[in-house]
Amino acid sequence: MAVAVIQEFPIEGEDRTTTNYDRVQEALGVRENPPPGALVHTAGFDEEAGVFRILDVWESREAWDAFLNDRLLPVVTPLMEQGGGRAPETRVYELHDYMA
């Protein structure tokens, strides 16, 4: 069953740069090598909520978990340890329906 994954990073002060996001995307190489099971990816600032939000749709929880463990965490963990941000609040839920 398809799942939505929402990750939210608090906006810190007046910082509206996407430097960390862009570094992660480049390191992941998702444009050249899309992860299996990824259906939709969005990212942007939600000023009202005070967060930078990533919203993805995946074919299944298993596809998301594989991407998280095999590709995403190996890239972001060293960056966070070097002071490049903190872990987001992450929510995953099954979808009844989606359109892409």
Residue ranges and their predicted role:
Residues M1-L73, Q82-A100:
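Short S/T/G/P-rich N-terminal loop/turn motif that feeds into the first structured element of a domain
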